[in-house]
């Protein structure tokens, strides 16, 4: 129970006396205040019913109101009346505007309410208008685009007097201290939407905003569906891995008499000293340095035990503990970041996840990866289906090269059109080099890798690498031609546009001369270096184009699947993971037809009793 202070700020706010009819309005902005106590540690409690809506703010062009229903400090209105009226507002055909729609819409659905009409999100709009901002919260966007920030002064003063956090514990305050703040939020969301419409028109990103808006209901359904996890198997695997880790450490102790702390460099140093093994020191502090690569590739059996113990430890602490922490009634409901936002997300349009981050579930470790992924299981009487675009990046490269009719692309184009082509094999044959080297060079160029890194990946001398690159570019000219064209365009225009119209902007500048320089905004770069400057990071332009276009394809496919009532559990990298029952062929066809390229799309499909059985 919080202690009411002797004095509180004077406020004039009063709750609305009526429930206005908003049916004549085309656009309605909505902002919720919630009790969401574990938001920071576990993510939003809307899906797991861990929390509740405490008040509803609604704004239209000439009115706004805040309806408090569950404030701990009192001043609430009749819940039934408010929710009945609010459902009426949600039933109208008006566009419903939110800032960070995923959060509020999930709480609305959790309350048992349904939303009619299109849902738009000013945070998504902000991210499409400028994907390189530092912040996307309502206050920051409002300040920058509308000239109005969030005024939290009274709210913060009151919360301080009550001894509570003005954001996380706002629900504890009497409604009278929150009302004006909540109304301002809804009103600012509406004003921001009016400005964002102009900005999106100006930037010509209305089509991609439409795509992201169409995708949103699918993502809400994915959030509520979640993914089943076998918690019993998770506990058992945890115990098994803990025992294996102990076994590794026991072997080290038996050999060296040292209880090694596997994450402490000073402790590992003692083992190396005992075994008379050389090791590196950091340049700055001369402290011992033991990188993952160094330990894993070390020939000594005791060092291998330390490396293995670290891998096992990471698997059960980072991954299994996270799965168990976030599982609720045998399911995980991860938060999906649709675009770049304060919660995460990417500049390319690809998804990211939080609470937990499903993209961190290991895939590369041949032994531990499948064990951890095997904890993810399909719906009852279904199989786990993994669908991914076959060679998505190479196909996009060929698509863009074909559009520009670049020299040498016809051979690959013909091979794709004739059937089951493998890009890396075709390129290897064209360049007269082994497939493994062709694949390394292909992917290195697609990802904007520098020459030195690519040479290291190839594992050859500088001379051999130079000879390989020369041979590759002579025999497979269209890749370098495309790279140069995309780079030139990004340098000239400061932006490139993906398959479905997403903008990738290059907003930072650096001096023309070679060297290591910090990339700066235009004015700052001019001041620092004078007029001899160029756009920075344009060597990544092809990668941005491919990554952004791949995101477009995947998102369009998800929209088409959702229209057919198919909701994925997970979208990671290029794959969609879906519970399958006699509909795998249908899913493949929908995905292959979602976006038309100059080359045919191909979707690879694998299935099994769980995620771990799929290679």
Predicted features by range, described:
Residues 1-72, 133, 143-368, 377, ...:
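Conserved "right-hand" nucleotidyltransferase catalytic core of DNA-directed polymerases
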Residues 61-96, 227:
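Nucleic-acid-processing active sites and adjacent nucleic-acid-binding tracks
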Residues 114-131, 137-140, 420-424:
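Conserved beta-strand -> loop -> alpha-helix junction used to position metal-binding or nucleic-acid-contacting
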């Amino acid at each position: 129970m919080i202690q009411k202070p002797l004095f509180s700020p004077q406020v004039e706010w009063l709750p609305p006396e009526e429930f206005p009819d908003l049916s004549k309005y085309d656009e309605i902005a909505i902002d919720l205040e919630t009790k969401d106590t574990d938001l920071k540690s576990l993510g939003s409690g809307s899906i797991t019913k861990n929390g509740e809506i405490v008040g509803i703010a609604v704004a239209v062009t000439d009115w706004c109101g805040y309806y408090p229903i569950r404030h701990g400090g009192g001043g609430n209105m009749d819940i039934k009346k408010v929710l009945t009226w609010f459902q009426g507002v949600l039933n109208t055909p008006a566009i419903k505007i939110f800032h960070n729609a995923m959060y509020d819409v999930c709480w609305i659905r959790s309350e048992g309410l349904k939303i009619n009409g299109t849902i738009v999100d000013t945070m998504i709009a902000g991210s499409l208008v400028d994907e390189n901002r530092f912040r996307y919260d309502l206050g920051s966007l409002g300040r920058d685009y509308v000239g109005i920030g969030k005024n939290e002064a009274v709210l913060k003063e009151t919360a301080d007097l009550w001894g509570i956090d003005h954001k996380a514990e706002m629900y504890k305050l009497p409604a009278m201290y929150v009302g004006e703040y909540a109304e301002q939020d809804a009103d600012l969301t509406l004003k921001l939407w009016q400005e964002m419409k102009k900005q999106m028109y100006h930037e010509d990103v209305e089509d991609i905003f439409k795509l992201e808006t169409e995708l949103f209901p699918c993502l809400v359904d994915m959030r509520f569906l979640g993914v089943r996890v076998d918690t019993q198997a998770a506990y058992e695997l945890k115990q098994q891995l803990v025992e294996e880790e102990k076994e590794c450490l026991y072997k080290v102790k038996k050999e060296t008499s040292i209880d090694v702390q596997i994450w402490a460099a000073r402790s590992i140093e003692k083992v190396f000293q005992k075994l008379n093994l050389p090791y590196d020191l950091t340049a700055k502090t001369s402290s011992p340095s033991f990188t993952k690569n160094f330990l894993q590739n070390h020939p000594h059996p005791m060092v291998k035990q330390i490396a293995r113990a670290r891998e096992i430890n990471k698997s059960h602490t980072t991954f299994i503990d996270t799965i168990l922490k976030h599982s609720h009634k045998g399911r995980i409901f991860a938060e999906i970041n649709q675009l770049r936002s304060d919660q995460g997300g990417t500049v390319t349009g690809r998804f990211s996840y939080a609470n937990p981050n499903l993209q961190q579930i290991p895939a590369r470790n041949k032994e531990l990866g499948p064990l951890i992924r095997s904890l993810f299981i399909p719906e009852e009487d279904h199989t786990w289906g993994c669908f991914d675009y076959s060679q998505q990046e190479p196909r996009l490269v060929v698509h863009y090269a074909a559009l520009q009719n670049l020299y040498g692309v016809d051979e690959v184009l013909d091979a794709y059109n004739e059937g089951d082509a493998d890009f890396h094999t075709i390129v290897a044959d064209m360049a007269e080099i082994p497939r493994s080297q062709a694949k390394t060079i292909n992917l290195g160029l697609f990802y904007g890798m520098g020459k030195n890194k690519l040479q290291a990946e190839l594992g050859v001398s500088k001379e051999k690498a130079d000879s390989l690159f020369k041979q590759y570019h002579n025999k497979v000219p269209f890749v370098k031609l495309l790279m140069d064209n995309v780079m030139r365009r990004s340098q000239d225009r400061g932006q490139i546009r993906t398959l479905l119209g997403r903008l990738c902007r290059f907003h930072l500048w650096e001096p023309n001369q070679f060297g290591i320089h910090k990339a700066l905004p235009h004015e700052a770069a001019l001041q620092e270096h004078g007029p001899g400057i160029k756009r920075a990071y344009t060597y990544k332009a092809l990668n941005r184009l491919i990554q952004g276009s791949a995101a477009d394809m995947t998102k369009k496919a998800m929209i088409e699947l959702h229209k057919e009532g198919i909701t994925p559990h997970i979208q990671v990298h290029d794959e969609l993971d879906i519970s399958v029952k006699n509909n795998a062929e249908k899913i493949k066809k929908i995905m292959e037809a979602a976006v038309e390229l100059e080359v045919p799309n191909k979707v690879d499909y694998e299935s099994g009793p769980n995620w771990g059985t799929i290679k």
